[in-house]
């Protein structure tokens, strides 16, 4: 009887150890699969400007690209979420620990595919500005991680800079710059930029799809938007797209 119990205990211990090893293996595999997918996708080649294009850029103002965070560049969920939108077992890119209302909260943050490459490229074309409806203590920490000491996300606006209207946070781009002809906002929420639809580029909300290429797909358009004197002359033709998201 004693030997039988010892045998059962040994089997259970072996099963427990095997299960933990398998879970760790899946964790590492999923993390590396995301990296492999990003580097296998075709990148956007940055070509040298012709003399004519360079002269054109010298005759227009440098544009400002305003970037939303949640569901545009990243997705996060925090402790206590019963049904997170991320597939269980998917490792976060980083974890933030912040104190909200005197309570410590952990946020598990997932970066949208290609966001690092996207920021590296567009920072060469635009002055980048973060504008999020999130609280500053959270938004600032996320922006720090995305910036990664490159000093490309220095200007930041948070919930206190938004206007609350019927329960929605509206982003007033005039706080970013008084000349809206040179301001572009990239945001997954049309309600956030409803005061400035002619300055907006819509993007689908992202939660967990590892094959998403939305940020890469926007690079040709953002490349071209550097050249017109007024970005609204181009983006106003795209208003029908805002209803899709």
From Swiss-Prot:
Domain of life: Eukaryota
Catalysed transformations (reactions): O-phospho-L-seryl-[protein] + H2O = L-seryl-[protein] + phosphate; O-phospho-L-threonyl-[protein] + H2O = L-threonyl-[protein] + phosphate
Keywords, in A-Z order: Endoplasmic reticulum, Hydrolase, Membrane, Nucleus, Protein phosphatase, Transmembrane, Transmembrane helix
Molecular function terms from GO: phosphoprotein phosphatase activity; protein serine/threonine phosphatase activity
Gene Ontology, cellular component aspect: cytoplasm; endoplasmic reticulum membrane; Nem1-Spo7 phosphatase complex; nuclear envelope; nuclear membrane
PROSITE patterns: FCP1
SMART domains: CPDc
Positions of transmembrane segments: 7-29
Protein localization: Endoplasmic reticulum membrane; Nucleus membrane
Gene3D superfamilies named in the record: HAD superfamily/HAD-like (3.40.50.1000)
Main enzyme class: hydrolase
EC number: 3.1.3.16
Coiled coil start-end: none
GO biological process: head development; nuclear envelope organization; positive regulation of triglyceride biosynthetic process
UniProt-listed InterPro entries: Dullard_phosphatase, FCP1_dom, HAD-like_sf, HAD_sf, TIM50
Domain called FCP1 homology: residue spans: 58-225
Family matches, as CDD domains: HAD_FCP1-like
Bilayer disposition of the protein: Single-pass membrane protein
Major localisation: endoplasmic reticulum
Family: Belongs to the dullard family.
PANTHER family in the cross-refs: DULLARD PROTEIN PHOSPHATASE
Function field: Serine/threonine protein phosphatase that may dephosphorylate and activate lipins. Lipins are phosphatidate phosphatases that catalyze the conversion of phosphatidic acid to diacylglycerol and control the metabolism of fatty acids at different levels. May indirectly modulate the lipid composition of nuclear and/or endoplasmic reticulum membranes and be required for proper nuclear membrane morphology and/or dynamics. May also indirectly regulate the production of lipid droplets and triacylglycerol. May antagonize BMP signaling.
Protein name: CTD nuclear envelope phosphatase 1B
This protein's encoding gene: ctdnep1b
